[in-house]
Regions:
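Terminal amphipathic alpha-helical/low-complexity segments used for targeting or macromolecular assembly
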Residues: 1-81
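Structural signal for interior beta-strand "rungs" in well-ordered beta-sheet cores
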Residues: 77-160
Length: 160
């Protein structure tokens, strides 16, 4: 039985849980500082993470996400089965790729980034650490998204 500990039990945490369930995780728990139904607070990660196969951060704030990502011993990457990831693309640990996304040839998605439903990371593009490429956004070919940047829904990001 694959197990997953998710840091953050807000709306995005619930979305991450649904992807994890589709991918076959059966034991899924949360750490959250604000919700009493979580099994603990974010600071409990050091004690609790050894009881899980893998961990992931599902927190929207990129600074908080980055800080918590550094604490994970076994960060995982969750990719929805409907996403299309090129064989030559590079997707690092702690990334969430939602339904109907495309990560094209030679694209790179770095640690802790969220690629939201329907987004496209075109060929040779780079999404740096802890970014959020929101629903139906496009990162144009050869473009680079800086650390912690949110590309808004339906926005086209290009910097060529």
């Amino acid at each position: 039985m694959k197990s997953l500990l998710i840091l953050g039990d807000g709306g995005y945490g619930q979305l991450v849980k649904e992807i994890a369930e589709i991918l076959g995780y059966r034991k899924i728990s949360f750490l959250d500082d604000n919700l009493p139904i979580a099994i603990g607070k974010l600071n409990d990660i050091d004690v609790l993470q050894d009881s899980y196969d893998e961990t992931i951060v599902a927190i929207g704030n990129p600074l908080v996400r980055s800080q918590n990502l550094l604490k994970l011993k076994n960060p995982t990457t969750l990719i929805h089965p409907s996403a299309v990831i090129s064989k030559s693309a590079e997707v690092k640990k702690g990334v969430v790729i939602e339904a109907n996304c495309v990560v094209s040839a030679s694209a790179k998605v770095y640690e802790g980034s969220f690629i939201c439903a329907g987004a496209v990371v075109n060929h040779n593009a780079v999404v740096n650490k802890c970014c959020q490429i929101d629903c139906n956004a496009v990162v144009s070919a050869f473009s680079k998204v800086p650390d912690g940047k949110k590309v808004a829904s339906c926005e086209v990001w290009k910097n060529i």
